């Protein structure tokens, strides 16, 4: 299988890539299939079942809302986040769903959308969509899995244990960090150069660069919105947004940087908090590689652009390419789904990606980049996913800030060494996968363990 940088970084909507972006894409794919097979006009009823982690925390993650929007033909990268609430209210009050925006059917959420805690066999985030005609006969049924980071596979792909259906031949194919580093050594390339060459299999280099700078712009817009917007986050926990107030404090007292050598970390915290508060509010974010961990790479990239002399757009492109190469290793050899391996697969992976990427743009050798990425994951091993109330708020928002700072520190440690290290990136990825498999399901995005049951919702 072949994965692109744009498979790892996708423009979407909050609060969750696996529970919001994935279900929306699956729902849209299902109704597009109805139209493709000529079944849309005959459809009078659609029933949806969300299983496992989707069933357990789907309400808090907005999975139900995502499904409704997807059935109406919306996609995460283009849906107007400003009109979502009004559209959902209209669907629910009128009891009508406009499939693909062109075929209206009756829809009662209590009857037609079920959330079931029991998982389907292949993955904790399973979904079944069924369409019926006027006689009540089932005319189409599909089973989908949201496998993390907005990736969706259908039942056929799941049966073949495939992540994507892309078999595009690449100039430098790699399955492991060992393979990746071998390409770098043989051809004298950096990791970002290997990735950029591979991207040419899909599009010209100029398009790849432009696409990555667009991703960066969305990240900047998200941070700006998070620094501007205030209030209480939705969902019932009454979590107060903090980024805007922190931004005012930092701008009001810039001379503090002269007194406090660690004041730069306040800015890193700000960037991460801003992104994840926007995500929790259902705003426009970039999966990096997931929504739950969407603040780390933007925060570290903002750190690079604001505080590192000589930073520029070329560095942004190299940063994102390197981060994607590392993310692909986790995607193919472990998981980026909190429902499958806990938060080590989300915040842990994002921390590892950001660390390796920052190390490259700061001039680190390929070996130092691998070391930084390994450190970023090694010290996130065992991290649980236990969101209070099933919401991507506590501990998720602060955890992104902690992961961002940890990534920067991993780079500093790696750059002070010669690239030689005891634990390889491949071994830590394998360890993460095994740790996730051993982790009890109550710690994997079900809101049935950890903080989720020890903190009373207010």
Regions found by a protein language model. Give the residues of each.
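Short alpha-helical scaffolding segments that buttress acidic/His motifs in well-ordered protein cores
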Residues: 8, 12, 268-276, 319-327, ...
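Conserved phosphate/anionic-ligand binding catalytic regions in large, soluble enzymes, centered on
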Residues: 9-27, 281-300, 341-352
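Alpha-helical support elements that line or immediately flank enzyme active sites
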Residues: 18-35, 298-310, 355-363
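Short, mixed-charge aromatic SLiMs
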Residues: 45-58, 90-97, 319-333, 374-387, ...
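C-terminal regulatory domains involved in ligand/effector binding and gene-expression control
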Residues: 76-256
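Accessory "access/gating" subregions that flank catalytic or transport cores
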Residues: 203-342, 450-458
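Hydrophobic alpha-helical bundle architecture
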Residues: 311, 322, 328-401, 413-422
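Extended hydrophobic packing segments that form well-structured cores
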Residues: 422-458
């Amino acid at each position: 299988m072949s994965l692109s940088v744009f498979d790892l970084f996708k423009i979407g909507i909050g609060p969750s890539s696996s529970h919001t972006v994935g279900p929306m894409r699956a729902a849209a794919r299902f109704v597009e299939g109805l139209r493709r097979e000529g079944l849309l006009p005959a459809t009078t009823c659609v029933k949806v079942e969300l299983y496992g982690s989707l069933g357990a925390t789907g309400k808090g993650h907005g999975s139900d809302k995502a499904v409704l929007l997807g059935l109406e033909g919306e996609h995460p990268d283009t849906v107007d986040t400003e009109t979502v609430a009004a559209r959902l209210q209209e669907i629910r009050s009128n009891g009508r769903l406009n499939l693909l925006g062109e075929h209206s059917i009756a829809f009662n959420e209590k009857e037609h959308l079920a959330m079931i805690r029991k998982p389907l066999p292949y993955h904790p985030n399973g979904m079944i969509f069924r369409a019926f005609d006027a006689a009540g006969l089932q005319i189409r049924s599909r089973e989908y899995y949201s496998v993390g980071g907005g990736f969706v596979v259908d039942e056929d792909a799941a049966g073949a244990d495939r992540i994507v259906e892309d078999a595009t031949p690449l100039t430098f194919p790699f399955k492991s960090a060992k393979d990746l580093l071998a390409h770098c050594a043989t051809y004298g390339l950096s990791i970002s150069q290997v990735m950029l060459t591979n991207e040419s299999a899909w599009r010209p280099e100029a398009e790849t660069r432009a696409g990555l700078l667009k991703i960066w712009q969305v990240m900047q817009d998200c941070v700006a919105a998070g620094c501007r917007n205030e209030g209480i986050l939705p969902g019932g926990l009454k979590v107060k947004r903090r980024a805007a107030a922190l931004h005012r404090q930092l701008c009001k007292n810039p001379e503090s940087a002269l007194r406090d050598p660690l004041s730069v970390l306040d800015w890193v915290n700000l960037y991460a908090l801003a992104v994840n508060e926007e995500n929790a509010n259902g705003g426009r974010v970039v999966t990096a590689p997931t929504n739950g961990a969407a603040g780390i790479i933007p925060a570290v990239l903002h750190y690079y652009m604001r505080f590192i002399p000589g930073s520029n757009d070329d560095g942004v492109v190299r940063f994102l390419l390197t981060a994607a190469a590392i993310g692909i290793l986790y995607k193919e050899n472990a998981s980026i789904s909190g429902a499958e391996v806990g938060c080590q697969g989300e915040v842990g992976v994002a921390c590892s990606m950001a660390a390796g990427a920052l190390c490259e743009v700061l001039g680190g050798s390929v070996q130092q980049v691998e070391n930084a990425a390994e450190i970023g994951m090694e010290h996130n091993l065992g991290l649980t996913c236990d969101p209070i109330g099933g919401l991507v708020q506590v501990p998720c928002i602060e955890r992104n800030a902690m992961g961002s700072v940890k990534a920067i520190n991993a780079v500093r440690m790696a750059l002070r060494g010669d690239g030689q290290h005891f634990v390889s990136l491949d071994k830590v990825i394998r360890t993460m996968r095994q740790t996730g498999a051993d982790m009890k399901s109550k710690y994997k995005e079900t809101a049935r363990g950890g903080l989720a049951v020890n903190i009373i919702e207010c």
